[in-house]
Amino acid sequence: MSRRRRANKRVITPDSKYNSVLLARFINVIMRSGERSIAEKIVYGALSKAENRIGESAMSVFSSALNNVMPQMEVRSRRIGGVTYQVPVEVKEDRSVSLALRWISKAAATARKRSNKMYMDCLCNELLEAYNKRGGAYKIREEKYKMAEANKAFSHFRFN
């Protein structure tokens, strides 16, 4: 049994423009080297472009894109009797949100490397793709689901 105590959750202050904790977390994911103002400029720019393209509010586009990418199941490695099994487990909501934010950022960064577009444009495109249940982040989620479905037989090895 571990002697260390459980780490306290940090309280994240909502972002200044939309007053949303989720958006503040997304800005933290996008942020590199502590450059918060640059990360805010990128995220707010991408959201305003998405808002102009679709015609819905920026927060509704962001929240529905996030909900479409959030995973419900994932696989975890569990070693039993010298054999490692990929055991499907349900994802807690906090981890699910964190994964979705990371996947959207990662998909936009991958698109940025492939094209000569600015990161803001790639992030806008990725948010719109996730909103429409397509794109790189949604594809990552579907791959995770396929892995969980393929290893459904090992679900009785759940973690305690």
Swiss-Prot record:
Keyword Transit peptide attached: no
**What are the recorded GO MF terms, alphabetically?**
rRNA binding; structural constituent of ribosome; tRNA binding
UniProt xrefs under Pfam families: Ribosomal_S7
Which SUPFAM superfamilies does the record associate with it?
A: Ribosomal protein S7
Output one GO BP term.
translation
Q: A cellular component term (GO) from this record?
A: small ribosomal subunit
Assembly and oligomerization: Part of the 30S ribosomal subunit. Contacts proteins S9 and S11.
Q: What does this protein do?
A: One of the primary rRNA binding proteins, it binds directly to 16S rRNA where it nucleates assembly of the head domain of the 30S subunit. Is located at the subunit interface close to the decoding center, probably blocks exit of the E-site tRNA.
Kindly give the HAMAP family that the UniProt entry links to this protein: Ribosomal_uS7_B
Q: Which PANTHER family match?
A: RIBOSOMAL PROTEIN S7
The name under which this protein is listed is Small ribosomal subunit protein uS7
- The scientific name of the source species is Ehrlichia ruminantium (strain Welgevonden)
Q: What is the lineage of its organism?
A: Bacteria, Pseudomonadati, Pseudomonadota, Alphaproteobacteria, Rickettsiales
Q: Which gene encodes it?
A: rpsG
